[in-house]
């Protein structure tokens, strides 16, 4: 059975749970390492999602069909 693709919000919530768990310091080392690895994967997934959203917004906001970076106003 195919694994359901989680939404950005679901991934973020999972990452927050992992961070809170690790911050307590009450986690055995092996579990902490596994949780840390999962947190890194989630972080990378979230970064990719945000990057893709930024690219999409840049295309939507472009004038004359040219892609404009979201920070174009800051550069001018």
Curated annotation (Swiss-Prot):
One term under GO cellular component: exodeoxyribonuclease VII complex
Record's function text: Bidirectionally degrades single-stranded DNA into large acid-insoluble oligonucleotides, which are then degraded further into small acid-soluble oligonucleotides.
Principal place of residence: cytoplasm
GO BP terms, alphabetized: DNA catabolic process
InterPro entries, sorted: Exonuc_VII_S, Exonuc_VII_ssu_sf
Keyword Ion transport: no
Catalytic activity: Exonucleolytic cleavage in either 5'- to 3'- or 3'- to 5'-direction to yield nucleoside 5'-phosphates
UniProt-recorded name of the protein: Exodeoxyribonuclease 7 small subunit
Compartments, as annotated in UniProt: Cytoplasm
Keyword line: Cytoplasm, Exonuclease, Hydrolase, Nuclease
Subunit text: Heterooligomer composed of large and small subunits.
Name of the gene: xseB
Catalytic activity, EC: 3.1.11.6
Principal EC category: hydrolase
Organismal lineage: Bacteria, Bacillati, Bacillota, Bacilli, Lactobacillales
UniProt-listed PANTHER family: EXODEOXYRIBONUCLEASE 7 SMALL SUBUNIT (PTHR34137:SF1)
Family: Belongs to the XseB family.
MF GO annotations: exodeoxyribonuclease VII activity
Pfam family, one: Exonuc_VII_S
């Amino acid at each position: 059975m195919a694994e359901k693709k989680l939404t950005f919000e679901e991934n973020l919530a999972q990452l927050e749970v992992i961070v809170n768990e690790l911050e307590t310091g009450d986690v055995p080392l092996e579990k902490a390492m596994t949780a840390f690895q999962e947190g890194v994967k989630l972080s990378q997934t979230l970064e990719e999602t945000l990057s893709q959203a930024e690219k999409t917004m840049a295309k939507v906001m472009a004038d004359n069909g040219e892609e404009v970076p979201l920070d174009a106003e800051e550069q001018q």
